[in-house]
């Protein structure tokens, strides 16, 4: 609970995973027209999690047309392998899972070295 006189600030970042993949730009554009300024990308490799989703090429092509903040959630094994690709694709923040990175400290430091914000996802199970 917030202290009296302190306001909590929340940011909503809709995930494009729920979008129609054949119309990603149209879906993102519609969200931006509605006021969305943060967009969440769930990047899955089919190994860390069973599904496969976006990769750097899709993020890069949407970045060319969008000024929104790109929040990239890496659900992949050894995310450090993909960090430069995410930077070059236009990610503003990259969140990784502690259990997916052999050297968590190196991965988080590398995200920051590349000029992105670093996030850490914890599995509550």
Residues of each region from the PLM?
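A structural motif
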Residues: 33-38, 67, 91
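Short, Lys/Arg-enriched N-terminal segments with co-localized hydrophobic residues
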Residues: 1-7
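Conserved anion-binding
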Residues: 20-23, 65, 81-82, 91-125
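Catalytic cores of alpha/beta
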Residues: 28, 80-88
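Glycine-rich, proline-tolerant flexible connector loops at the mouths of alpha/beta enzymes
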Residues: 39-56
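Alpha-helix-loop-beta-strand connector modules within alpha/beta enzyme cores
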Residues: 52-72, 110-119
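Conserved, mostly hydrophobic/aromatic
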Residues: 24, 31, 42, 86
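Hydrophobic faces of well-ordered beta-strands that scaffold small-molecule active sites
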Residues: 10-15, 39-41, 70-74, 94-96, ...
